Amino acid sequence: MKRLTSFFIAFIFCCNLFAQDTLKVGVMLPLHKIDGDGKRMLEYYRGLLLGIEDLKKQGKNITVHAWNMPANGDARTVLVREGASNCNIIFGPLYSKYVNLMADFCKAYNIKLVIPFSITGDHVDHYSNIYQVYQPQSWIDETTVQRIMINFTGYHPVIVNCNDTLSKKGSFTNMLRQAYETRGIQYNITNVQNPDDTFEKAFSTKRKNLVILNSGRSPELTKVITKLDTLKAHNPEMEITMFGYNEWLMYAKYNKANFEKYNVHLPSNYYHNENGKQVQALQDRYFRNFHENMQYALPRFAITGYDHAMYFLGHSTRWLQTPLDFEKVPGGGYRNKAFYLIHYKPTGGVEAVKY
């Protein structure tokens, strides 16, 4: 089936929802301050409320029912609550064990079910009313490898072994190596602990170099950047581009100059622009309304909630941090395909390029 545009899906989604005079929204998430899950989902819920507040100012009639659905709870006791079956759309759950029951419930009452965060299972393949925002890591890896093959044609790949026993990037680098080998593209592997002269031999002086680490952690990144600085000092004309990981966005505040110097590209399904005027305004508004700052997490949960409200309830494809781009699953629901490369430009500045 041909991919539908994000705006078209959002528009049709909201036309169906707003066919009634009042849109009834349900939220079924752990909404408490007992643990990290509860605090994060409470912040997400608050972001939803801020978005709904803006939509009401635009003339939308929206009511919200929120139910606490903790990890040790029973979804059945929530689903029988007054108002649950009257919802037009429900945001939740957080925990995979509740999905089957909620999906069946929403199917029976013709309710749209937005699953905003990580779950396991293939429910979106079987339920036409599910909108799955979460992207499996395997899909992210495959999409990233495909994008590397397209965007960095002609580059000389250098994979750096960081000796990180805690790394979870082995499956990605293996997939990347297989893609290079299938296409007959030569790549070199070196080790961050190699002597400088040995490390240098892995690089090309005639072609642009694309450096990929087999670790996403900050200490290993720092070691490699130090190694590259030495390499560039001896070879000032050598061209180096680094392709990193989503986790690097957490380190960008302290590495912006290095990211720009090495033309860093990061795959992501969000971009938090701390200096953006609208982002700052929403963060300030959050503090005024709830008397505390958003948690220091990427992506910001409150802004994610706000973006979800504007997309699902207001058919807006403009986003502050968390873009959505859904594709219809044949015989099932909708899966989020939003994918960006965050590019730190050597000339300064950052751009988020959609693919």
Task: Kindly label every feature range from the protein language model.
Residues I225-I303:
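Extracellular/periplasmic periplasmic-binding protein-like sensory domains
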Residues Q20-R81:
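N-terminal extracellular/periplasmic Venus flytrap/periplasmic-binding protein-like
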Residues G26-V27, N86-Y95, L113-F117, H156-N163, ...:
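Periplasmic-binding protein-like
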Residues E292-V353:
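Segments of small-molecule ligand-sensing domains
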Residues A66-N72, F117-I119, V133-I140, N161-F172, ...:
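Hinge/beta->alpha junction and helix N-cap segments in small-molecule ligand-binding domains
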Residues N72-N88, D197-K206:
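Short, well-structured alpha-helical segments in soluble
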Residues M1-V25, Y355:
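Bacterial Sec-dependent N-terminal signal peptides
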